[in-house]
């Protein structure tokens, strides 16, 4: 557990990300894929039901012993809240109401944010669009760990701690890599979320509030679903920047595992990404992919060649248009 990883820097590359070229090739060969570029109305009802489910859980846990509050937060609430963050990811791509009703998606994202307890849906949208446009770009893509993370979390034990603390790094990393001015929508998001948290505490008590926050922190840390954070872009095979996952947890995560497909076609809702793979099978079947996020987490911690430095990084060329 004390061996240092062999990597001492990111994998600097001088080529463009592969997704734009593959998207052009696939659309030229299979133009019918354009018919999948439309919102998913079912997403709206799924998100509403998830919010109502957590509201019911807040009520149930208010009188439980503390041990059951924490157990429930990890065993049940964490799955709902992590899944909700991926629902917010779908909403960030305007998958709920479509591009023509962009603001409806922003308001709905704030609604979906409520049971998570921490305001982030508006900020996430801004940074996530940069992640797609400028994948791996130094000083722009905040999905890339900081140099400190790569330098410090360099043993199996430290990488294990890094996995546990993932939600904190995702929350604070943008402030160090690519800080942006606060927008009025972020203020509204924050006011709405803080008001909701206060109401939960006032009407249901501290246990419900702790359950909500613990479900988010535990669900985004050492949790099977959190394997997607690492599986998506950490370079387990040299030269491969994005990896898909085709295991059963896609059922809980809006098919976020179909990540090559998602980066190739970010305006196609998650529910249709398996169809993209089916139509253009020759483009995806031979790409390296995963079937277990748990194994990804284990390999990340135990493999001395993998660390937070295991990301492809590039100096962005030309003028950037940031969200």
Swiss-Prot record:
E.C. code: 1.14.19.17, 5.2.1.-
Residues linked to a lipid group, N-myristoyl glycine type: 2
Keywords for this protein: Endoplasmic reticulum, Fatty acid biosynthesis, Fatty acid metabolism, Isomerase, Lipid biosynthesis, Lipid metabolism, Lipoprotein, Membrane, Mitochondrion, Myristate, Oxidoreductase, Phosphoprotein, Transmembrane, Transmembrane helix
GO cellular component: endoplasmic reticulum membrane; mitochondrial membrane
Transmembrane stretches, start-end: 41-61, 68-88, 107-127, 152-172, 184-204, 209-229
Sequence motif Histidine box-3, residues: 259-263
Short sequence motif named Histidine box-2, residue ranges: 128-132
Predominant cellular place of this UniProt entry's protein: mitochondrion
Location in the cell: Mitochondrion membrane; Endoplasmic reticulum membrane
Domain of life: Eukaryota
InterPro entries, alphabetized: DES1/DES2 (IPR011388), FA_desaturase_dom (IPR005804), Sphingolipid_d4-desaturase_N (IPR013866)
An example Gene Ontology molecular-function term: sphingolipid delta-4 desaturase activity
Posttranslational modification: Myristoylation can target the enzyme to the mitochondria leading to an increase in ceramide levels.
Motif Histidine box-1, residue numbers: 89-93
CDD domains associated with the record: Delta4-sphingolipid-FADS-like
Modified residues (Phosphoserine): 307
Membrane topology type: Multi-pass membrane protein
Catalysed conversion reaction: an N-acylsphinganine + 2 Fe(II)-[cytochrome b5] + O2 + 2 H(+) = an N-acylsphing-4-enine + 2 Fe(III)-[cytochrome b5] + 2 H2O; all-trans-retinol = 11-cis-retinol; all-trans-retinol = 9-cis-retinol; all-trans-retinol = 13-cis-retinol
Family: Belongs to the fatty acid desaturase type 1 family. DEGS subfamily.
Role summary: Has sphingolipid-delta-4-desaturase activity. Converts D-erythro-sphinganine to D-erythro-sphingosine (E-sphing-4-enine). Catalyzes the equilibrium isomerization of retinols.
Assembly mode: Interacts with RLBP1; the interaction increases synthesis of chromophore-precursors by DEGS1.
Descriptive protein name: Sphingolipid delta(4)-desaturase DES1
């Amino acid at each position: 557990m004390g061996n240092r990883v062999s990597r001492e820097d990111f994998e600097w590359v001088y080529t463009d990300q592969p997704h734009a070229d593959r998207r052009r090739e696939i659309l030229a060969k299979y133009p019918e894929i354009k018919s999948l570029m439309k919102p998913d109305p079912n997403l709206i009802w799924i998100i509403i039901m998830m919010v109502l489910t957590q509201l019911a859980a807040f009520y149930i846990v208010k009188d439980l012993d503390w041990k059951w509050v924490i157990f429930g937060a990890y065993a049940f609430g964490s799955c709902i809240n992590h899944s909700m963050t991926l629902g917010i990811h779908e909403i960030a791509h305007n998958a709920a109401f479509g591009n023509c009703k962009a603001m409806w998606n922003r308001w709905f994202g704030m609604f979906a944010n409520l049971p998570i307890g921490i305001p982030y849906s508006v900020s996430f949208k801004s940074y996530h669009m940069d992640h797609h446009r400028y994948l791996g770009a130094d000083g722009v893509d905040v999905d890339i760990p900081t140099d400190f993370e790569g330098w410090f979390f360099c043993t199996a034990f430290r990488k294990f701690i890094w996995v546990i603390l993932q939600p904190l790094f995702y929350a604070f990393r943008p402030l160090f890599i690519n800080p942006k001015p606060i927008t009025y929508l972020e203020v509204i998001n924050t006011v709405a979320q803080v008001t909701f948290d206060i109401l939960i505490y006032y009407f249901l008590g501290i246990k419900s509030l702790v359950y909500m926050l613990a479900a988010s922190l535990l669900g985004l840390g050492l949790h099977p679903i959190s394997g997607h954070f690492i599986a998506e872009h950490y370079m387990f095979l040299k030269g491969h920047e994005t990896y898909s996952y085709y295991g059963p947890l896609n059922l809980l995560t809006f098919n976020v595992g179909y990540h090559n497909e998602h980066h190739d076609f970010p305006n196609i809702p998650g529910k249709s990404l398996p169809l993209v793979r089916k139509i253009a099978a020759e483009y995806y079947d031979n790409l390296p992919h995963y079937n277990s996020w748990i194994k990804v987490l284990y390999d990340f911690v135990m493999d001395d060649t993998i660390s937070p430095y295991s990301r492809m990084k590039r100096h962005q060329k030309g003028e950037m248009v940031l969200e």
